[in-house]
A protein has these predicted regions:
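Active-/binding-site microenvironments in catalytic and ligand-binding cores
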Residues: 18-20, 36-44, 50-53, 201-208
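Short, structured loop/turn "capping" segments at alpha-beta junctions
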Residues: 138-146, 174-181
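Short acidic, Gly/Ser-rich segments with clustered Asp/Glu that frequently serve as metal-coordination loops
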Residues: 10-14, 22-34
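N- or domain-start disorder-to-order transition segments that initiate the globular core
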Residues: 1-3
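Generic secondary-structure signature for well-ordered alpha-helical cores
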Residues: 39, 43, 47, 59-63, ...
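Glycine-rich anion-binding loop/nest that anchors nucleotide
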Residues: 146-152
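Long, charged alpha-helical interface segments
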Residues: 79-96, 100-106, 110-116, 130, ...
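Acidic/Gly/His-enriched mid-domain segments of enzyme catalytic cores or analogous surface patches
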Residues: 48-136, 142
């Protein structure tokens, strides 16, 4: 396995490509929220760069919901924001989610040419790892893995780098080779344990911003 990491999103469609499995990371909090949505039965997640695109898709697609945020707040006309608590089974089960967020959507769309794109966060860390390394999980012991961190407004974010680092460390333990400075830098940010994860998330710039919004 070869693993590459982008600590901030490259342009749309330029990360990975055919033959790659992509992992989009936005710990705070698109990929954490959408993990909850998937666990609660959401049928499909469609990322959009612009909120207007998500609204048009929602209006043209029976049963779809427009979801996400701008600058941490729900968008006017959207059905849901970007908190996992909004994505209860009775709300999202069987529904298609048109999702547009400030940072997370950019990470997902950067990977759109990959054969498959996973959403990664600490809340589903074990499931992501298993999908990447175990053939029976559907990942097929991925030969090429491209990881994109959402960052914050085009800047590095500690919480995303921490999860990317955790994933790199776990993949190296399974025989993977890190390719490029991004992957090596992410590995250097791998957290030491659960307490360090919590502190990194709470003290990150994005974590402090979300806390200020209540």
């Amino acid at each position: 396995m070869i693993v590459r990491v982008h600590l901030t999103p490259p342009p749309r469609g330029t990360a990975g490509g055919p033959g790659f499995v992509g992992v989009a990371i936005d710990v705070l909090r698109a990929t954490s929220t959408l993990t909850a949505a998937s666990a609660n039965g959401a049928a499909r997640i469609v990322p959009f760069a612009e909120t207007a695109e998500a609204l048009r898709f929602r209006d043209a697609t029976p049963g779809a919901l427009a979801c996400g945020e701008r600058d941490g707040r729900i968008v006017e006309g959207f059905d849901l924001g970007n908190s996992p608590f909004e994505y209860a089974p009775e709300v999202v089960s069987g529904r298609t989610l048109a999702f547009a967020s400030t940072n997370g959507s950019r990470a997902m769309l950067a990977l759109e040419r990959c054969d498959r794109v996973l959403l990664g966060a600490f809340v589903n860390a074990s499931a992501v790892l298993s999908t990447l390394v175990l053939p029976e999980s559907g990942g097929g012991a991925s030969a090429a893995i491209e990881i994109v961190c959402a960052g914050s407004l085009g800047r590095f974010s500690y919480e995303d780098a921490a999860f990317a680092g955790w994933l790199c460390r776990a993949l190296v333990a399974q025989g993977a080779t890190l390719d490029g400075e991004g992957a090596k830098s992410a590995l250097a940010h791998a957290p030491g344990g659960a307490d360090e994860v919590r502190l990194r998330v709470e003290r990150s710039q994005h974590g402090l911003m979300l806390a200020s919004l209540g």
